[in-house]
């Protein structure tokens, strides 16, 4: 652990220094690289042969939308539908401890793997892209309730703001960041990105 910290520090600062240098020569490429490091999850994916036990108990369904494959899991119940939205570097298996309690409600439960997470395709996990996934899933399963955790909670709020789904009666938001700027600032500080890159990234989000 002691050796990992200096290595991680040097790695992040080296990446940041390279992006800063690149921003003066190829600014568009520098922003693309910074955006990639910020939005690409490093964990949360798995393959079908490594499907968590919790998800094996569900009905697995995929939705194809444009070039995306959206993975969903359904636990059948009554006509009321609860849609579960996980957070950053996660997947639908994160609900395993909550599922037994939700099943007692009798509702049909639908969980979604976000972009570049679980079995869903993609390389980037962003709020607008995730909200688009939610909208496609919501059109098919017509949820009455949405439960979102962390970035999934923030995305749930953004989804309802943008798409105005009249069928959604209630939303439960768990541990969602109150200010996305804080997350972005932490990222730019970690890499010591220059003001030029910082401002462009902020405008992008």
Provide a role label for each language-model segment.
Residues 5-62:
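An N-terminal hydrophobic leader/cap segment in hydrolases
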Residues 122-145:
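Alpha/beta-hydrolase active-site loop
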Residues 168-205:
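The alpha/beta-hydrolase serine catalytic core
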Residues 147-156:
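Gly/Ala-rich beta-loop-alpha elbow adjacent to hydrolase catalytic centers
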Residues 70-80:
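Short beta-strand-to-loop junctions in surface cap/lid or active-site-entrance loops
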Residues 79, 86-90:
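Active-site glycine-rich loops that stabilize anionic/oxyanionic intermediates
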Residues 92, 99-121:
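Conserved alpha/beta-hydrolase
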Residues 145-147, 171:
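Conserved alpha/beta-hydrolase fold motif
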């Amino acid at each position: 652990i002691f050796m990992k910290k200096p290595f991680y520090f040097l790695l992040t600062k080296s990446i940041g220094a390279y992006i800063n240098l690149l921003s003066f020569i190829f600014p568009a490429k520098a922003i693309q690289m910074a955006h990639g490091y910020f939005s690409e999850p490093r964990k949360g994916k798995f393959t079908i042969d490594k499907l968590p036990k919790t998800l094996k108990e569900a009905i697995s369904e995929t939705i194809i939308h444009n070039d995306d494959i959206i993975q969903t899991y359904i636990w059948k119940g009554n006509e009321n539908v609860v849609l579960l939205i996980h957070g950053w570097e996660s997947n639908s298996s994160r609900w395993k401890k909550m599922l037994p309690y939700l099943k007692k409600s009798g509702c049909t439960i639908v969980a979604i793997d976000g972009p570049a997470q679980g079995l869903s395709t993609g390389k980037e996990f962003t709020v607008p892209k995730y909200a688009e996934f939610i909208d496609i899933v919501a059109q098919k399963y017509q949820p009455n309730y949405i439960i979102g955790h962390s970035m999934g909670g923030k995305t749930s709020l953004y989804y309802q703001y943008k798409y105005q789904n009249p069928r959604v009666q209630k939303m439960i938001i768990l541990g969602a960041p109150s200010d996305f700027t804080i997350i972005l600032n932490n990222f730019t500080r970690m890499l010591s990105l220059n003001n030029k890159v910082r401002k462009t990234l902020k405008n992008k989000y």
